[in-house]
């Protein structure tokens, strides 16, 4: 049961991306936070995110605009390392406050507040149509690459920023999708080894079974959805998911998670 519930949660969160209108990382991070410590949750989300995009790149890779994709990735990669470093940094800060609730001690920490606020912000960006459709001029592409890489390394939230800065770059629909997938893989391939090295040094990697199987189930959810389901958005599901994301983020910020 200890393993079945995390696997079901991971599979369901990944599968819901095809009905809720939210991105894979936006849903998986809070789902994994319910299962494992924060840093491991960020790592597991990154692994599933990259596996899913490696599957996509096989299908759309021929459409990559290498000029824009490489320019974006070159800036995003060091920014992702910086984001990962900042995650390490705030993780080591002392807790802000500790309190007892239901006979359990809960801590409000900087890393919980930061990730909780980022979860709230990016969930709102993907939920509110006017926010989701924000676009930036091509001249700001380097800034977009830096921001996308940094927040990708810090919390995994990279897709919304990447799209907002790429959408006016003159790319065809196919090139936009393919280039975005390539950039996402570049960021994930950078931050995942960094996370592994950092967490192993801090002895913060949990039991292999406790995160390997949920990670596999999350990938299976994304793979099955990609393979067999036309992506549709159901408004009621989107609203319910937004409420759940807000609840999890609030619990994280207040130290209850």
Language model: regions and residue ranges:
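Transmembrane helix exit motif
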Residues: 53-59, 83-96, 112-137, 226-227, ...
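Hydrophobic/aromatic positions within or immediately flanking transmembrane alpha-helices
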Residues: 42-43, 70, 112-115, 177, ...
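Membrane-interface alpha-helices at helix entry/exit sites of multi-pass transporters
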Residues: 38-44, 67-68, 170-183
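Selected transmembrane alpha-helices and immediately adjacent juxtamembrane segments
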Residues: 1-35, 125-180
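Structural signature of hydrophobic alpha-helical transmembrane segments
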Residues: 2-3, 32-50, 106-117, 146-156, ...
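Selective hydrophobic functional segments
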Residues: 43-102, 189-234
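Hydrophobic residues within alpha-helical transmembrane segments
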Residues: 8, 12, 47-54, 70, ...
């Amino acid at each position: 049961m200890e393993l079945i519930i995390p696997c079901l949660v991971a599979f369901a969160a990944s599968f819901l991306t095809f009905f809720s209108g939210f991105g894979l990382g936006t849903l998986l991070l809070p789902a994994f936070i319910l299962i494992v410590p924060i840093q491991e949750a960020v790592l597991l989300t990154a692994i599933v995110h990259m596996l899913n995009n490696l599957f996509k790149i096989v299908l759309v890779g021929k459409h990559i605009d290498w000029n824009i994709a490489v320019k974006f990735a070159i800036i995003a990669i060091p920014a992702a390392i910086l984001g990962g470093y900042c995650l390490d940094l705030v993780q080591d800060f002392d807790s802000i406050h500790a309190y007892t609730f239901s006979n359990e001690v809960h801590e409000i920490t900087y890393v919980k507040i930061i990730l909780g606020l980022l979860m709230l912000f990016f969930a709102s960006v993907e939920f509110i149509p006017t926010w989701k459709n924000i676009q930036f001029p091509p001249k700001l592409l380097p800034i977009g690459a830096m921001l996308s890489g940094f927040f990708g390394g810090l919390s995994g939230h990279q897709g919304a920023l990447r799209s907002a800065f790429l959408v006016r770059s003159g790319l065809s629909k196919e090139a936009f999708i393919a280039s975005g997938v390539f950039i996402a893989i570049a960021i994930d391939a950078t931050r995942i080894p960094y996370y592994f090295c950092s967490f192993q040094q801090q002895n913060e990697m949990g039991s292999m079974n406790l995160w390997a199987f949920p990670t596999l189930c999350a990938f299976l959810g994304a793979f099955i959805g990609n393979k067999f389901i036309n992506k549709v958005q159901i408004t009621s599901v989107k609203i319910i998911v937004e409420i759940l994301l807000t609840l999890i983020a609030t619990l994280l910020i207040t130290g209850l998670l």
